[in-house]
Amino acid sequence: MDVADLRREYTRGGLHRADLPAEPLALFEKWLAQACEAKLTDPTAMVVGTVDADGQPWQRTVLLKHYDAEGMVFYTNMGSRKAHQLEGNPRISLLFPWHTLDRQVHVTGRVEKMSTFEVMKYFHSRPKDSQIAAWVSQQSTRISARGVLEAKFLELKQKFANGEVPLPSFWGGFRVRIDTVEFWQGGEHRLHDRFYYTREGEGWHIERLAP
């Protein structure tokens, strides 16, 4: 398949320096709300980038579960590839690809582990089947067939039918302490708007970048 001529124009309007808030999370929250209003599929989906011990980058899609002035939060199996990589190198990249709105947001920072209390509170807010699934999957390990997972799920669903699903010891979360945020808005003639927030002490420095 020849993909060289697959392209389109970006015509949704620009992003102007005068309209930017002092804090990047204020603009992120506005854009996220607009992504939800536009009924984008999985508006909280973000591409999480990590690096392994050999310097090889890895990416996968994870759902954002909370954000505030302290950072952005996601949960995962702590035995997973990404968790092991973050243990060795806490630097992380997050990308929110809101293509339908001609937008993307790129976040960089460092992770710290969530407390057991925070993890447990979120874990027990999940649908029960999702809690059971956390026990079933030893994420990133090799399995012989999907049937192995399905059989284990049915076994545990019966086991926990009449009681609470306990928090797995291998399940946890990370908070991303944000260092930089870049907002990208597609523009006509490929003259896109890019604004880059860098943390400086208690505030933020904002720069416009060439597209």
From Swiss-Prot:
Catalysed reactions, semicolon-separated: pyridoxamine 5'-phosphate + O2 + H2O = pyridoxal 5'-phosphate + H2O2 + NH4(+); pyridoxine 5'-phosphate + O2 = pyridoxal 5'-phosphate + H2O2
Record keywords, A-Z: Flavoprotein, FMN, Oxidoreductase, Pyridoxine biosynthesis
Residue numbers binding FMN: 60-65, 75-76, 81-82, 104, 139-140, 184, 194
Superkingdom classification of source: Bacteria
Signal sequence range: none
Keyword Oxidoreductase: yes
Enzyme kind, highest EC tier: oxidoreductase
InterPro entries documented for this protein: Pyridox_Oxase, Pyridox_Oxase_CS, Pyridox_Oxase_N, Pyridoxamine_oxidase_dimer_C, Split_barrel_FMN-bd
Pathway: Cofactor metabolism; pyridoxal 5'-phosphate salvage; pyridoxal 5'-phosphate from pyridoxamine 5'-phosphate: step 1/1; Cofactor metabolism; pyridoxal 5'-phosphate salvage; pyridoxal 5'-phosphate from pyridoxine 5'-phosphate: step 1/1
Entry's EC annotation: 1.4.3.5
Record-listed substrate binding positions: R7, R8, E9, Y10, K65, Y122, R126, S130, R190, L191, H192
Cofactor binding note of this UniProt entry: Binds 1 FMN per subunit.
Cofactor(s) the protein needs: FMN
Pfam families: PNP_phzG_C, PNPOx_N
BP terms from Gene Ontology: pyridoxine biosynthetic process
GO molecular-function term, one example from the UniProt record: FMN binding
Function statement: Catalyzes the oxidation of either pyridoxine 5'-phosphate (PNP) or pyridoxamine 5'-phosphate (PMP) into pyridoxal 5'-phosphate (PLP).
UniProt family annotation: Belongs to the pyridoxamine 5'-phosphate oxidase family.
Quaternary context: Homodimer.
Protein name: Pyridoxine/pyridoxamine 5'-phosphate oxidase
Native species: Aeromonas hydrophila subsp. hydrophila (strain ATCC 7966 / DSM 30187 / BCRC 13018 / CCUG 14551 / JCM 1027 / KCTC 2358 / NCIMB 9240 / NCTC 8049)
